[in-house]
């Protein structure tokens, strides 16, 4: 049954969704996708606006980030298939589920906003594919929103660090650090590799130290990104009170 469901999802993405969701499918293009992210108000999370001809508009996806628009396609296709298989899923379930993902699942650290003025966002991107998606978002923030980038970054030693460093924006200020796990790459070694890759920045022994430095150096109008290894994000979230992040 699982294999059948996965195969049906692929078919739905290729065939059914383009007919039912022409507006939403077009959002796969990053330039279009960003238009679907509604900045509701300060200190409130961004939300992706979803339009589907099979039910009323006004459905908002709590998880933000450009790559989430593609994830929505898979979710909506899977829900259509589950309904066809006999599962009872009403319109209210769509609204409740999409707008309360984090509260219902406990999911954290996926393009999660922790502060305004300056904006501080965290996300995990511990491999090349992950950072390809993050790079698109950072590029938009820098080039279209005209915000300078301050990036707190760390990785574990057993990943393809060189390839990830090549994807990072060259015009950002970096705060290289390490997570509180044995696998974490030492911050000085990471900084050496980063400098060789054309990046600029300073190393810090802990995530807390790095984030504090970024907050001190970043003007209110600019942008702080914290990411790399999932452990970096975990250390950040574990120290939200210490860093006065809400």
What are the roles of these predicted feature ranges?
Residues 1-3, 150-152, 172-180:
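Short internal beta-strands
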Residues 1-58:
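Extended acidic/charged loop-beta regions that coordinate divalent cations
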Residues 9, 31, 71, 123, ...:
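Residue-level signal for inorganic ion chemistry
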Residues 16, 44-45, 119-121, 128, ...:
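C-terminal helical cap/extension that packs against the catalytic core
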Residues 53-173:
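Nucleotide phosphate-binding/pyrophosphate-handling subdomain across enzymes
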Residues 126-127, 157-158, 180-182, 230-232:
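Short glycine-rich anion-binding loops that position phosphate/pyrophosphate groups of nucleotides
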Residues 229-246:
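Glycine/aspartate-rich loop-and-adjacent alpha/beta segment that forms the canonical ThDP
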């Amino acid at each position: 049954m699982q294999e059948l469901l996965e195969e049906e999802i692929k078919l739905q993405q290729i065939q059914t969704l383009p007919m039912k969701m022409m507006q939403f499918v077009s959002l796969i293009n990053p330039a279009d996708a960003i238009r679907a992210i509604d900045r509701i108000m300060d200190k409130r999370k961004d939300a992706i606006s979803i339009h589907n001809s099979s039910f009323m508009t006004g459905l908002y996806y709590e998880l933000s980030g450009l790559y989430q628009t593609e994830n929505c396609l898979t979710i909506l296709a899977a829900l259509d298939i589950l309904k066809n298989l006999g599962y009872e899923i009403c319109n209210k379930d769509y609204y409740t589920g999409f707008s309360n993902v984090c509260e219902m699942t406990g999911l954290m650290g996926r393009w999660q906003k922790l502060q305004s003025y300056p904006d501080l966002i965290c996300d995990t991107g511990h491999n090349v594919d992950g950072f390809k998606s993050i790079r698109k978002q950072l590029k938009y923030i820098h080039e279209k929103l005209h915000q300078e980038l301050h990036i707190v970054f760390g990785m574990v030693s057993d990943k393809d660090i060189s390839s990830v460093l090549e994807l990072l924006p060259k015009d950002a200020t970096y705060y290289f650090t390490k997570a509180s796990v044995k696998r974490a790459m030492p911050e000085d070694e990471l900084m050496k590799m980063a400098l060789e890759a054309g990046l600029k920045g300073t190393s810090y022994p802990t995530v807390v130290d790095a984030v504090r430095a970024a907050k001190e150096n970043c003007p209110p109008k600019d942008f702080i990104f914290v990411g790399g290894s999932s452990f970096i994000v975990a250390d950040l979230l574990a120290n939200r009170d210490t860093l006065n992040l809400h």
